[in-house]
């Protein structure tokens, strides 16, 4: 429960940029242990799942993952249009993503 509260607070910082797209309804947030990714967005279920392990990453990297997953509500893939959406909110997204590789 502590981890979900933590990621909910982080998500609340990003949500206003997507409120219109989401019709004013926040997505369901889940947290679980994952080994192959930091987060997963399921637009059809209006759900984002964050990796429990993300909690131990730097805050700048955490925000990157939150923004990344929210951007999947706009673009379902990792096309140039998707990365353009990420860049609108986080011009330094590449540096933030690198933090996750350390």
Where do the PLM segments sit?
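Walker B catalytic acidic pair
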Residues: 69
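Active-site-proximal or metal-binding-adjacent scaffold patches in catalytic folds
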Residues: 1-64, 73-102
């Amino acid at each position: 429960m502590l981890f979900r509260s933590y990621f909910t607070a982080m998500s609340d910082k990003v949500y206003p940029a997507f409120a219109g797209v989401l019709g004013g309804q926040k997505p369901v947030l889940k947290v679980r242990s994952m080994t192959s990714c930091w987060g997963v967005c399921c637009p059809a279920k209006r759900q984002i799942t964050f990796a429990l392990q993300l909690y131990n990453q730097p805050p700048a990297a955490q925000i990157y993952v939150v923004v990344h997953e929210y951007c999947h509500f706009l673009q379902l893939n990792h096309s140039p249009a998707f990365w353009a959406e990420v860049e609108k909110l986080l011009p330094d997204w590449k540096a933030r993503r690198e933090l996750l590789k350390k």
